[in-house]
Regions:
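N-terminal, positively charged/glycine-rich alpha-helical extensions of SAM-dependent methyltransferases
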Residues: 1-21, 182
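Conserved alpha-helix/loop element of class I SAM-dependent methyltransferases that forms part
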Residues: 21, 30-51
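Class I SAM-dependent methyltransferase SAM/SAH-binding core
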Residues: 52-110
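C-terminal alpha-helical "lid/dimerization" subdomain adjacent to the S-adenosyl-L-methionine
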Residues: 80, 157-213, 223
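A short acidic, Gly/Pro-enriched loop at the edge of an enzyme's catalytic core
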Residues: 109-121
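A short SAM/SAH-binding and catalytic strip from SAM-dependent methyltransferases
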Residues: 119-133
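A short glycine-rich, Lys/Arg-flanked "PGG" loop and its adjoining helix->strand segment in the class I
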Residues: 134-149
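Core SAM-dependent methyltransferase catalytic element
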Residues: 217-241
Length: 241
């Protein structure tokens, strides 16, 4: 995850309490959908046959490892949480991919890489935690070479009224309790935080506004796929030559 504004320092502290059981509980609490969403994200990155990939908000390196397994690329993963990166490095070592994957501490809003340094960029669950999503998208695109592919994944609010009502009930009532039972107080806090955070983000940044931000950053042919009745969304596009 990547957090940049003072308003979201709460989120930084919140997620720093989660690394040890993050991957298991993320799958359980998303009914196994997180893995499907990640696979869709990786498909668009791998299809570009990149040699250098940047994975932003890499967390425990799940996406970075999946990209390395699906391509011949060298993957650089960045995150603001040293606790998550520590787990990620152990996972990379366990997968015997230390020569293929490098993990660093960095913020999505100010990447320590040159213009056009990467052939492809992936990012997950980032834009809800930055003060200016459009500026962050532009910063990501800056490090992408012309013709390179960028793909992002995040939660979404289901567009159909029945699915949205079920989603609202789950995120406001079921998710906090399930988190408490399975992961303790830290996951109770996350469960209470996520639903309102997701809803608030898309009130400020509806899909049309996000698409405009991608295009303003020089990404063309932007497409998206709503998944799991709209509970998740994957977006992708190519940097204008």
């Amino acid at each position: 995850m990547a957090v940049g504004s003072a308003d979201n320092e709460f989120a930084v502290k919140l997620f720093r309490r989660l690394p040890r059981r993050y991957d298991l509980l993320a799958e359980v609490l998303s009914f196994g959908q997180n893995a499907r969403w990640r696979a869709e994200l990786v498909k668009h990155v791998a299809g570009a046959e990149p040699l250098q990939v940047l994975d932003v908000a890499t967390g425990t390196a799940g996406v970075a490892i999946a990209i390395a397994r699906s391509t011949d690329a060298h993957v650089t993963g960045v995150d603001v949480s040293e606790e998550m990166l520590e787990i990620g490095r152990a996972r990379v070592a366990g997968a015997a991919m230390q020569t293929r994957i490098e993990l660093k501490s960095a913020r999505a809003e100010a990447l320590p890489f040159g213009d056009g340094a990467f052939d492809a960029i992936s990012f997950t669950y980032v834009l809800r935690y930055v003060s200016d999503p459009a500026a962050t998208i532009a910063e990501l695109a800056r490090t992408l070479r012309p013709g390179g592919v960028m793909a992002g994944l995040d939660f979404y609010v289901p567009p159909s009224p029945p699915a949205r009502a079920a989603w609202w009930l789950y995120t406001r009532a079921v998710l906090p309790v399930a988190g408490l039972v399975l992961g303790g107080r830290a996951w109770w806090d996350v469960g209470r935080f996520l639903g309102p955070n997701i809803s608030g983000h898309y009130r400020r940044w509806p899909l049309a506004r996000l698409l405009d931000a991608w295009e303003a950053a020089g990404i063309e042919g932007v497409e998206y796929r709503q998944m799991s009745l709209g509970g998740g969304i994957v977006m992708w596009g190519t940097k204008r030559a």
